[in-house]
A protein has these predicted regions:
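Hydrophobic, well-structured mid-protein blocks that either form specific transmembrane helices
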Residues: 106-150
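Intrinsic low-complexity/disordered segments
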Residues: 1, 20-21, 145
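Bacterial N-terminal signal peptides that target proteins for export
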Residues: 1-9
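Cleavable N-terminal signal peptides
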Residues: 9-10, 20
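Extended hydrophobic/Leu-rich segments
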Residues: 11-13, 89
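N-terminal signal peptide c-region/cleavage motif recognized by signal peptidases
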Residues: 15-19
C-alpha cells in the first residue's frame, strides 16, 4: 500500500509540473483538471473511524463529484455515506445545481438540495419536506466546496467566507488564512499547505482546512469539531490527477 501511494504521488507530481506552476493564479476552465481521485483516512477523537474515496470529473462546462465514506470496525454498521454533487463549471468556479446525501439503506436519512440560481433560492429537502433559504453567489455543498478553492485567486490571504449547504441547513464558515505555509507529511508524500483556521466568530461547529498549495488547493487535512466537541480528522493518503 505504501509503495502504491508513493508511486501515485510521484506520477501526480509529474503531471502537475507539466500543466501548472507552484505559484498558480486564478485557474481557468482550460487548465481545470479533468479528473481528480482522492482517498482519505478519518479518525474520530484520535481513533480509526472511516475511509473516504472521492472522484471529481469535469467535462467541458459541467462537473460531477462523488464521495463515498465507509466506516471501519463497528462504524461500518452505519452503512456507506454517499455524497453527489452536479453542476456547471464557470469562470468563477463550480456552480452546483443538485446535491444529494444518502446514508446506508435508510431513505429517511437522505438529504438533497436544489440550487435555483435564477431565483437565488436554495431548496433543501429533509425527510421529504422542502426547506428554502436565500441562495448567495458562490454557495457550495458538502461535496463541491473542497474543489472550489482551486478557482480562487492565489495566493490566498487575509480572510475568506465559505457558504455551504449540508442538505439540511445552510452554514457560513469564516476563516482567517495563515500566510506562512505548513508542511504535512502523509503516506509517503510531503505537501506544502495553506492553513485556513476558523475565525473567533465561529462558536459552534467548526471546520479547519489545510490546502495543498501546489496541487490545486485540494484539502490535505480537514479537522471538524461539532457542537458536542467530537473531533473528526480527515487526512489525505492518495491523490491522482489527470
Amino acid at each position: 500500500m505504501f509503495n502504491h501511494i508513493k508511486i501515485l504521488s510521484f506520477l501526480f507530481f509529474l503531471s502537475i509540473s507539466l500543466i501548472a506552476s507552484a505559484q498558480q493564479t486564478v485557474i481557468s476552465k482550460n487548465t481545470l483538471p479533468k479528473r481528480i481521485q482522492a482517498a482519505y483516512e478519518v479518525t474520530k477523537n484520535g481513533q480509526p473511524f472511516a475511509k473516504v474515496h472521492e472522484l471529481f470529473v469535469a467535462t467541458e462546462n459541467v462537473y460531477k463529484i462523488e464521495s463515498i465514506t465507509k466506516g471501519v470496525g463497528v462504524y461500518a454498521l452505519f452503512g456507506e455515506r454517499q455524497l453527489t454533487s452536479v453542476g456547471d463549471v464557470t469562470a468563477q468556479g463550480l456552480k452546483p445545481t443538485r446535491f444529494e446525501l444518502h446514508q446506508g439503506s435508510n431513505a429517511k436519512r437522505s438529504l438533497s438540495a436544489d440550487f435555483d440560481w435564477a431565483k437565488q433560492n436554495l431548496i433543501m429537502t429533509v425527510k421529504g419536506q422542502p426547506k428554502e433559504a436565500p441562495l448567495a453567489q458562490g454557495t457550495q455543498d458538502l461535496a463541491s466546496y473542497a474543489y472550489q478553492f482551486m478557482f480562487l485567486p492565489a495566493p490566498l490571504k487575509d480572510a475568506i467566507t465559505v457558504s455551504l449547504t449540508t442538505g439540511k441547513k445552510l452554514n457560513q464558515y469564516q476563516y482567517r488564512i495563515n500566510v506562512e505555509p505548513e508542511m504535512i507529511d502523509s503516506a509517503g508524500a510531503s505537501y506544502k499547505t495553506l492553513h485556513l483556521a476558523p475565525s473567533e466568530q465561529n462558536n459552534t461547529e467548526t471546520k479547519e482546512l489545510w490546502l495543498a498549495v501546489e496541487y490545486y488547493y485540494v484539502p490535505v487535512r480537514i479537522l471538524m469539531v461539532d457542537d458536542h466537541g467530537q473531533k473528526l480528522e480527515q487526512t489525505l493518503i492518495e491523490l491522482y490527477v489527470e
